[in-house]
């Protein structure tokens, strides 16, 4: 998995749920892009906005088993957010490694606070380790840190405090965890 600057992507939980619901109800396997556009499932206002959302959603959908697609539609909000974050982590190495190297490390050491300096330190380390990240613009790097914060907050792993983020362990439906263990990328758990 390559490092990518996904500065224009968002969490897109509603769009993922709507797309999965549409796929399940209509047993769609071909022409997904065309059908989503015709039915305005992604609720976009322009062709470029549709293309941007579709490309992101389609990439993430490929990470989900049919069972996870069903679960993101039918499960509770916290579990749906987790499934959506899982689909992001399956595709975005920079965010996955932050979760593994910073969040998990701190959590395992009973340190439940992530400060701005932790984000900056992670970015500096990754810039040293990867020419790709080192070549991102300063603005691109800043936006990627914002994406990490937003995605992990929306995914249920972080909670914003006054001057830091609190690490929380999301409560996820056991059926979702079991599905990922059996048929998905267990490393992400």
Regions flagged by a language model, labelled:
Residues 83-86, 90-113:
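Positively charged, polyanion-binding regions of nucleic-acid-associated proteins
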Residues 1-82:
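Eukaryotic partner-binding/assembly regions in large regulatory complexes
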Residues 60-63, 101, 105, 125-129, ...:
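Amphipathic alpha-helical interaction surfaces
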């Amino acid at each position: 998995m390559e490092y990518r600057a996904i500065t224009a992507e968002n969490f897109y939980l509603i769009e993922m749920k709507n797309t999965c619901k549409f796929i399940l109800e209509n047993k769609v396997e071909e022409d997904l892009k065309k059908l989503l556009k015709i039915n305005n499932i992604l609720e976009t206002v322009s062709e470029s906005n549709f293309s941007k959302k579709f490309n992101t959603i389609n990439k993430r959908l490929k990470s989900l088993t049919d069972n996870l697609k069903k679960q993101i539609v039918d499960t509770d909000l916290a579990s749906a957010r987790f499934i959506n974050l899982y689909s992001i982590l399956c595709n975005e190495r920079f965010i996955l490694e932050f979760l593994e190297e910073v969040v998990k490390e701190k959590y395992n050491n009973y340190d439940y606070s992530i400060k701005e300096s932790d984000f900056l330190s992670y970015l500096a380390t990754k810039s040293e380790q990867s020419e790709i990240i080192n070549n991102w613009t300063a603005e691109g790097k800043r936006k990627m840190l914002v994406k990490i914060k937003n995605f992990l907050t929306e995914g249920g792993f972080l909670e914003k405090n006054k001057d830091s983020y609190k690490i929380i362990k999301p409560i996820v439906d056991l059926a979702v965890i079991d599905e990922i263990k059996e048929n998905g990328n267990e490393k992400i758990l």
